[in-house]
UniProtKB/Swiss-Prot annotation:
GO cellular component entries: mitochondrion
Signal peptide positions on this chain: none
Family classification: Belongs to the short-chain dehydrogenases/reductases (SDR) family.
Primary role: Catalyzes the NADP dependent reduction of L-sorbose to D-glucitol.
Catalytic activity as recorded in UniProt: D-sorbitol + NADP(+) = keto-L-sorbose + NADPH + H(+)
Main enzyme class: oxidoreductase
UniProtKB keywords: Carbohydrate metabolism, NADP, Oxidoreductase
Source species of the chain: Schizosaccharomyces pombe (strain 972 / ATCC 24843)
Binding, NADP(+): 21, 95, 163, 167, 195, 197
Full protein name: Sorbose reductase sou1
GO MF entry, a single one: sorbose reductase activity
EC number of the protein: 1.1.1.289
Length: 255
């Protein structure tokens, strides 16, 4: 049974690879035998992370700087990584994302909305396109989006209209592509709840206290509690699973 979860000899690319969730996924996938490409924006820690994966797990691992909101850059970087990591792409994880609190009525700065949409939604779509060409040529592949519980409900008390909207769109994009790409790829998503990463660092103690109060497990999740869902969706254990979304939120959406 455990062999169904093996990724030995496969290649995985992860956008947002220098973040808490992205690197946690990378560690789990490398431990399962996958070569790993980390696509990152500005955080050059991805270079150190790639070296760590190579040294600890003996897999191929490289880091690539890539502005995820730039379609041409995403496609070019994906093609480069595929060529350098073995010539095929088995798993693509569209994980890059940002959240910027803003007042939807009072905030007249359109730059916030445009930036969040550019990274969270456009970037996810460009990532899918880049991977889809390889999957179609190969006749097989697994695309996994990092959505959010914010795509299911509107978080409170923070005001994240742009984040909520983009993550709901990403979740439905996954379902749409699962239908369109059924002949050659599986497409699914994972919806994390409140996870202790750089994305939530802005929150003061009062806000974090509210998050815990609203979560049935009464705590904020850790990045290392997420990779199991991604590993399942990437592996042969989920060969008949497409168009699904796995919520990992400590029970938040079940209240």
């Amino acid at each position: 049974m455990t062999s169904m979860f093996s990724l030995k000899g496969k290649t995985t690319l992860i956008t947002g690879g220098s973040g808490g969730i992205g690197f946690s996924i990378a560690k789990a996938f490398a431990a399962a035998g996958s070569n790993v490409g980390l696509l990152y924006g500005r955080n050059k820690k991805a270079l150190e992370y790639a070296a760590e994966l190579r040294d600890k797990h003996g897999v191929q691992a490289k880091a690539y700087s890539c502005p995820i909101e730039n379609r041409s850059a995403v496609i070019e970087t994906t093609n480069q990584a595929v060529e350098e990591l073995g010539g095929r792409l088995d798993v693509m994880i569209a994980n890059a994302g940002i959240a910027i609190p803003h007042l939807s009525l009072e905030d007249k700065n359109e730059d916030i909305w445009t930036k969040v949409v550019g990274i969270n939604l456009n970037g996810a779509y460009y990532t899918a396109q880049a991977a889809g060409h390889h999957f179609k040529k190969q006749g097989k592949g697994s695309l996994i989006f990092t959505a959010s519980m914010s795509g299911h409900i509107a978080n409170w008390p923070q005001q994240w209209a742009s984040y909520h909207a983009t993550k709901a769109a990403v979740k439905h994009l996954a379902r749409a592509l699962a239908v369109e790409w059924a002949p050659f790829a599986r497409v699914n998503s994972v919806s994390p709840g409140y996870i202790d990463t750089d994305l939530t660092l802005y929150a003061d103690e009062n806000l974090r206290k509210k998050w815990k109060e609203y979560t049935p497990q009464a705590r904020i999740g850790l990045p290392d509690e997420l990779p199991g869902a991604y590993l399942y969706l990437a592996s042969d254990a989920s060969s008949y699973c497409t168009g699904s979304d796995i919520i990992v939120d400590g029970g938040y959406c079940s209240r």
